[in-house]
Amino acid sequence: MAMSSGTLRISATLVSPYHHHHRNRLSLPSSSSKVDFTGFISNGVNSLETQKCTPGLAISRENTRGQVKVLARNTGDYELSPSPAEQEIESFLYNAINMGFFDRLNLAWKIIFPSHASRRSSNARIAKQRLKMILFSDRCDVSDEAKRKIVNNIIHALSDFVEIESEEKVQLNVSTDGDLGTIYSVTVPVRRVKPEYQDVDEAGTITNVEYKDTRDGSVDVRFDFYVPE
């Protein structure tokens, strides 16, 4: 740029550029790095002024024999912390640069053609599956009275075939499955199958053995011994 009273020249110099392989943090250039702007004027006085305008940045302005020089440098006491997303991207790029040719090819293949398992585990599919489970639960939810009737009907049906240990221990459990929806399962403690419905011959078999300590040095033993009629 030409001026009638002199020549104006602006120059920028960066001595120590930021190293891109730094993975942990993002910092300003070191204290030896500088950016200077130099201009020439026809008349001027000798002066030197230093101003620290922002944390980590100092600006010096020098006027010597008609030459104005402005120097901006990093004081080394200020750092910029990257966001988690920037850290992840920087780490990914750093690892990709250090990969071999076949590793890069394999990575590119996985990005372009993701596996079936990766597609299934996507956030959209997970959200859809959860919604499906909630809908199943809403459609299959029953009242407490209905649950008691379910338990009573099951006990009545099983009593024709087995001897139930205790009706009070019968439990109704409700669970949710991703593919099947809401599952109702009933736990019934059974003492034994009734003789007329037994699949094997239990003649002479001892079952339901119980031990009771009498606290006088002896033990009472009770058991069932099946003798067919």
Curated annotation (Swiss-Prot):
Outcome when changing residue 134 to R: Abolished interaction with MIND1
| Consequence recorded when altering residue 124 to R | Normal interaction with MIND1
Annotated tissue distribution: Expressed in green tissues, especially at the shoot apex. Also present in leaves, stems, buds, and flowers, especially in sepals, siliques (tip and base), and anthers (mostly in pollen grains).
Transit peptide, residue positions per record: 1-30
Record keyword Chloroplast present: yes
Name one molecular function that GO assigns to this entry: ATPase binding
> Keywords, A to Z?
Chloroplast, Plastid, Transit peptide
Q: Name one GO cellular component term.
A: chloroplast
Summarize the impact of residue 128 to A: Normal interaction with MIND1
Question: Where are the annotated segments for Homodimerization?
Answer: 142-169
* Record region (Interaction with MIND1): 35-141
Write down the superkingdom of origin: Eukaryota
What is this protein's function?
Acts as a topological specificity factor during plastid division and specify plastid constriction sites (such as the Z-ring) in a MCD1-dependent manner. Especially involved in epidermal plastids division in a FTSZ1-dependent manner. Required for the proper formation of FtsZ rings at the division site in nongreen plastids (e.g. etioplasts). May contribute to gravitropism in stems and hypocotyls. Stimulates MIND1 ATPase activity. In cooperation with MIND1, prevents FtsZ ring formation anywhere outside of the mid-plastids.
Whom does it interact with, and what assembly results? Homodimer. Interacts with MIND1. These interactions are required for proper intraplastidic localization. Binds to ARC3.
Entry protein name: Cell division topological specificity factor homolog, chloroplastic
User: Which organism does this record belong to?
Assistant: Arabidopsis thaliana
Give the encoding gene's name.
MINE1
